[in-house]
């Protein structure tokens, strides 16, 4: 067997005796914790300017309701409250038509909703004379769309 080497106790060196690399490491400031990825601090110079908030695009039928109103009664206006009610009314009607046409497509085991399902849904959802006018206007709009 090989003889064991004697272990010498490590001598503690003073700050002056330590190598230059260790002194450089000691001169550095303590390591700062990095902020989490989600919490970035804005630069100091940008703190003076206020950040513009992006608006959510809320789609409404207000401009179209107003155009139809001016076609029918050019001299009459509409309040914002009444406009909100009309917008809600149109959203509700479209929701009912979409649900009904979806049911019709499902009953017929069709994967798509065509103009035929929409037309049948209009006849089922809207009453009497209103359904007839809606169907005729819808057919007119579809033929105009396909011809152009």
From Swiss-Prot:
Annotated InterPro entries: Histone-fold, Histone_H2A/H2B/H3, Histone_H2B, HISTONE_H2B_site
Record PROSITE patterns: HISTONE_H2B
A single cellular component GO annotation: nucleosome
Residue list for modification N,N,N-trimethylalanine: 2
Post-translational note: Can be acetylated to form H2BK6ac, H2BK33ac and H2BK34ac. Mono-, di- or trimethylated at the N-terminus to form H2BA1me1/2/3. H2BA1me2 may be acetylated to form H2BA1me2K6ac.
Glycyl lysine isopeptide (Lys-Gly) (interchain with G-Cter in ubiquitin) cross-link site: 144
Subcellular location field: Nucleus; Chromosome
Residues recorded with modification N6,N6-dimethyllysine: 13
Name of one Pfam family that matches: Histone
Modified residues (N6-acetyllysine): 7, 12, 28, 33, 39-40
Record region (Disordered): 1-56
Compositional bias of kind Basic and acidic residues: 1-35
Any one Gene Ontology molecular-function term assigned to this protein's record: structural constituent of chromatin
Similarity field: Belongs to the histone H2B family.
Primary role: Core component of nucleosome. Nucleosomes wrap and compact DNA into chromatin, limiting DNA accessibility to the cellular machineries which require DNA as a template. Histones thereby play a central role in transcription regulation, DNA repair, DNA replication and chromosomal stability. DNA accessibility is regulated via a complex set of post-translational modifications of histones, also called histone code, and nucleosome remodeling.
Full protein name: Histone H2B.1
Natural source organism: Arabidopsis thaliana (Mouse-ear cress)
């Amino acid at each position: 067997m090989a003889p064991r080497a004697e272990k010498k106790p490590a001598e503690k060196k003073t700050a002056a005796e330590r190598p230059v690399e260790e002194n450089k490491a000691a001169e550095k400031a303590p390591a700062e914790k990095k902020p989490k990825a989600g919490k970035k601090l804005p630069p100091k110079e940008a703190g003076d300017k206020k950040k513009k908030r992006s608006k959510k695009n809320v789609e409404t039928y207000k401009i179209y309701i107003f155009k139809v109103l001016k076609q029918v009664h050019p001299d009459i206006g509409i309040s914002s409250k009444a406009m909100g009610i009309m917008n809600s009314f149109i959203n509700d009607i479209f929701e009912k038509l979409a649900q009904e046409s979806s049911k019709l497509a499902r009953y017929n085991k069709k994967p798509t909703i065509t103009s035929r399902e929409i037309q049948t849904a209009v006849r089922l959802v809207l009453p009497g004379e209103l359904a007839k006018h809606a169907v005729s206007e819808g057919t007119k709009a579809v033929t105009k769309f396909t011809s152009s």
